[in-house]
Amino acid sequence: MLQPFHVQTSSEELRTAVRRFESGLYGLAGQQVLTILQKNPEDQEALYFLRLVERRLTRAKPQAKPTLIWQFDPKAAWERDWVEMLLGGVVEKTVVDNTWSQLAETMIVVDNRLIEAKTPYYRRAFESGCRVILVHLSDEAFKDDLSAYRYCDAVIRNYRSELLAESARIQFIPLGYKAGLATPSAPKPASARKYLWSFAGDAKKLTRAEMLDAMAKIEGGHQHLTTGFASADALSTPAYRALLDDTVVVPCPGGWSNLESFRVYEALEAGCIPIVEKRPSFDYFTALLGPHPMPAVMSWMEGADLVKRLQSENALEPLRQSCAAWWTAYKPKLVRDLTEFVERNLKTT
């Protein structure tokens, strides 16, 4: 099992120090690791563990409110508005670095496409005594290098991982909606929306062709197919929001590597009913979000039948309202949960 935060050693002396640390005997653990380093000053795992002990011994000290540091241009980030909504209230200021050089006493670093070459920045922050929470974005295929995790106090990331979920120091967040999509307007009722269902995007991914074949049999739908993700023929953000505002049901098939997509939360933000996918013994969205009212289907024939049934039973508007109410309540709860997670791991209160 992947254990990105654990001390990795075959040394029985260091294992003894780790056991003392796990028992809350931080002073004894520190003495043990100093003894190890007297024998071998270049023992990298012992040096790493010494930093952990030192950080725990100084954990009661009051810490500054964290600085939010972007390591890529937030203007180009689909998650910009979402990240700022979730974390804006917990940070002192925001800095755009993009050079992996700036440090702060307490810092929340937003990064993506993690590779091994980025790890020295996080190690330098760790060895400088910085408190670090990493916001790790865009690892849809779970291919990023996670070696930076061990130098962070905690990690917030999108794309829930079954393996990483076992760590209490990792908090998962939904993908959220594309920057510029959220508006303060009240959602229209189902009866005032032009389209029973709609889909805008690339149809070539996994189950999307199956979804379109099934949904095309339902009258009142609308398709805007594109050549790829964020391609030139994609709708502008305002045009896509306008389409969603006029749509009741938004089928949300998975992407190349993951069941999750921005489409789910963009549909919720516009007051639509998202239909998501699930797998046998794998209900991704319940694992990520907890109980929710969004319909989850095993096949898109099932999804199309569901839409027909909801329409015939006049149940579209009640379900739409249920999804909208859940999403309205979920967002501030997520903000509270993240604030508590940040404060607990950075000891900012």
Model-found features: residue ranges?
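Canonical tetratricopeptide repeat
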Residues: 49-50
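Conserved donor-nucleotide binding/catalytic region of nucleotide-linked donor-dependent transferases
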Residues: 305-326
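Nucleotide-sugar donor-binding catalytic core of glycosyltransferases
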Residues: 59-265, 269-292, 296, 326-346
